[in-house]
Amino acid sequence: MNQSPTWHDVIGEEKKQSYFVDTLNFVEAERAAGKAIYPPAKDVFNAFRFTEFNDVKVVILGQDPYHGPNQAHGLCFSVLPGIKTPPSLVNMYKELAQDIEGFQIPQHGFLQSWAEQGVLLLNTVLTVEQGKAHSHSKTGWETFTDRVIEAINQHQHGVVFLLWGSHAQKKGRFIDRSKHHVLAAPHPSPLSAHRGFLGCKHFSQANQLLASQGKEPINWHLPLTV
């Protein structure tokens, strides 16, 4: 029998909490009212679907989902195939091209292969209304994602947290740095990337930290087309 804890084991109880029920009811009511809410209901929890709890090696924290049509699919910074690569991800690719030998910038922004290797691509808030950034902040999602980070902090060892921008850094302030590794930099947004995100070498550093623990490094290379 597999004794490894799953997401259900570590955050299953959260789904019974009144705040979480209220959050889901709010989102459902917004959809029922005819508002375009992203990502689609089936994709809201994809970060957990593609990266099982016990497989988490790296956590990248985003803020809220992309709010344009067909962009968000439940993994922070990632967009569906066929959608133009958003500006922050363009800068992530620029950094990868400098940092990871042989990295070729793909023609898409679909990051699922990272998630499948143990990179938890977690937004702080898991839904958004079309065209309205942060429209679902303070609806309970932040509490839920705090619990997610607390569970990783408590039950795992040697996870590498990539915290880009003040929002992510504030969110990760309680991470136990004697158990885990925290790499902080400005956000990859065009507004701040040149203040130290570009040149941060977080992708190679994350792999060095994983390798030093005997863990398999992340293959950051993406298929050129999807």
Swiss-Prot record:
Main location: cytoplasm
Keywords: Cytoplasm, DNA damage, DNA repair, Hydrolase
EC code: 3.2.2.27
UniProt cross-references to SMART domains, sorted A to Z: UDG, UreE_C
Catalytic site: 64 (proton acceptor)
Alphabetical GO biological process terms: base-excision repair, AP site formation via deaminated base removal
Pfam family, one: UDG
PROSITE patterns assigned: U_DNA_GLYCOSYLASE (PS00130)
Annotated family: Belongs to the uracil-DNA glycosylase (UDG) superfamily. UNG family.
Name of the protein in its database record: Uracil-DNA glycosylase
Organism: Vibrio parahaemolyticus serotype O3:K6 (strain RIMD 2210633)
